[in-house]
């Protein structure tokens, strides 16, 4: 029988690492908010990702979003987002997704500073990354400490078999998908049990628009 607590003890962040992440993230958030005030921007820093949800594994990274009011034109949040990102990560590199963003390291921790639009439940997204703010809120409202460790176990398992990660080279299980599966099935073992019995495609799509082997509806979508 697998000793899950022993597995978690090897992959869960140490208290020292958690303290380092907290100090670095608090400092960056303070700097971003100060810059936003000085530039009279209606925007604020928000910590998102697995660290914000307490499902992070050891040697993880930090995702910090700059959430702008929804009436800003896209070119403004792109320009200001890059300016702020470079200001708080001096040696950062520009990367490009739906919005350009700045990625770099501080104190040995990989950090992404990403601009987005503010979004509340029921709002239509303006850009794809906007929902990330709601993902954090949703997961934190549906996972307790035990559930967070169950997510960690699912992440560890999917990493070990090479199916963790939503990027094009993998098309696997994202961290958010792992969180939603544990919320739905309550435990790592229940998730594995469900997929071990699933036949063919796992699909919930009344309009039959998708051909993916598995489809899970994002609960924060209106």
UniProtKB/Swiss-Prot annotation:
Its EC number is 2.7.7.72. Pfam families: NTP_transf_2 (PF01909), tRNA_NucTransf2 (PF09249). Gene3D superfamilies: Beta Polymerase, domain 2, CCA tRNA nucleotidyltransferase, domain 2. Keywords: ATP-binding, Magnesium, Metal-binding, Nucleotide-binding, Nucleotidyltransferase, RNA repair, RNA-binding, Transferase, tRNA processing. InterPro entries: CCA-adding_arc (IPR008229), CCA_tRNA_nucleotrans_2 (IPR042090), NT_2-5OAS_ClassI-CCAase (IPR006116), NT_sf (IPR043519), Polymerase_NTP_transf_dom (IPR002934), tRNA_NucTransf2 (IPR015329). One of its GO terms (biological process) is tRNA 3'-terminal CCA addition. A single active site specifically recognizes both ATP and CTP and is responsible for their addition. Homodimer. This is CCA-adding enzyme.
């Amino acid at each position: 029988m697998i000793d899950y607590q022993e597995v978690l003890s090897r992959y869960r962040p140490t208290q020292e690492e958690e303290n380092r992440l907290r100090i670095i993230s608090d400092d960056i958030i303070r700097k971003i908010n100060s810059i936003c005030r000085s530039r009279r921007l209606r925007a604020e820093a928000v910590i998102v990702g697995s660290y914000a949800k307490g499902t992070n594994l050891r040697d993880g990274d930090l995702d910090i979003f700059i959430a702008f009011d929804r009436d800003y034109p896209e070119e403004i949040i792109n320009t200001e987002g890059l300016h702020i990102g470079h200001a708080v990560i001096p040696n950062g590199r520009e990367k490009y997704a739906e919005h350009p963003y700045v990625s770099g390291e501080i104190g040995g921790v990989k950090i992404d500073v990403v601009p987005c639009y503010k979004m509340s439940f029921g709002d239509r997204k303006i850009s794809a990354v906007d929902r990330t703010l709601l993902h954090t809120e949703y997961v934190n409202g549906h996972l307790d400490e035990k559930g967070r460790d169950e997510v960690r176990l699912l992440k560890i398992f999917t990493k070990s078999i090479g199916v963790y990660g939503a990027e094009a080279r993998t098309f696997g299980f994202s961290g958010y998908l792992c969180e939603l599966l544990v919320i739905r099935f309550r435990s790592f073992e229940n998730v594995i049990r469900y997929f071990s019995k699933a036949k063919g495609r796992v699909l919930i799509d009344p309009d039959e628009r998708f051909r993916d082997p598995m489809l899970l509806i994002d609960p924060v979508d209106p």
